[in-house]
Amino acid sequence: MSGAAAFGNIFRIPELKKKVFFTLSLLVVYRIGAHIPTPGINSVALAEIMSRMTGTMMGFFDMFSGGALSRLTIFALGIMPYISASIILQLMTMVSPYLARLKKEGEQGQKKITQYTRYGTIVLSLVQSTGISVGLEAMRSPTGNAVVLEPGWSFRIMTVLTLTAGCAFLMWLGEQITERGIGNGISLIIFSGIVAGTPAAIFQSMDLMGTGELSVFIMLFLMFFMAAVVGMIVFTEGGQRRISIQYAKRVVGRKMMGGQSSHLPLKVNTSGVIPPIFASSIIMFPATIAQFTTHPWMQNISAMLTPGTFVYSLIFIGAIFFFCYFYTAVIFNPVDVADNMKKHGGFVPGIRPGAKTSTYIDEILSKITFYGAIYLSLVCILPDYLIRYVNIPFYFGGTSLLIIVGVSLDTMQQLESHMVMRNYDGFMKKGKLKGRQG
């Protein structure tokens, strides 16, 4: 079935149509809020300063906030404080017996963890917005104009409250999209911010070509390179390692059950776009505060954490590897999978059911997660090095491409599952996912 026909099927399912329109309407609200300025800011002076931040961590953060940071709007903090709080809570579940118990309590326990994540988001937002408000008062544009019109405690309090409230509202939007809409709300908010800034980045690149700062040959090469990166993302995101499963025959009543074979699909990139987003959040939090301060040692930290530098790349790759394994362990438990297989009479040929099977699955998962982490690191880092030396906007970086393609694929898969469940054809053909049998 063609993509247009599959797209039309969305509007033939009332519940799905409602979810899609609900998601789009909340994303529109987000984009409107990304243009409402914070009170007390000299927008002209701020624009002069931010225009010189291209290629720095500030420019990278601005990409994730959908341009809200460069305009210092009510959503300037973006959704990163929420992501940072989520990381902290998930890490604490590994060392805190209380949080570990909550995690095992199912839905009620998860509600409490979510509540603690919200509290953590507010705390991190207060810290980050305080650093930004104090730093803004010391900032002056290249022409000597002050960024803050009336410095003082009234401006600081107003800015802290505005930015914190904006982040809390974005957190609520993301949760509403996840619960009542289509796709992961937090990922879609980041996705929509990047997509919204893409046209401006394209026009900026065209202006560079017009002034001769960027040759046509280099631009064509970059377009080909980005197309290759997108192709690599689509190809790898669909990759699977399939573990063969055989079900033993058994008599249930008067019927002979089982005997059929199946497989357990393990994605090459089980964790999706989460590791790069988490890694970016970890680096952005201190780098953003450092960028808004005038202390030399803080400025050195900000310079070291600029995308494309060796220190940034080392920390970013290390964080990607860590979160690949960590998040995969959070969403996939080989012990539970092996136990469920054993209960239903399933087994991996040549492997004893139970502990041996869980160990076998865990070993395979660890290997493909390693390759998945290498893939994510290459996609995120290599384009940034290329772009750093060609002076192309960061909207064309590897992380942004990965988020755009990855979130698009995840959202399409959710739409697909809704349509197939109601006996409608979806976007993807059967058997499209490739895998290695094992």
Where are these regions (language model features)?
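N-terminal cationic and glycine-rich segments that engage phosphates or anionic surfaces
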Residues: 1-103, 108-438
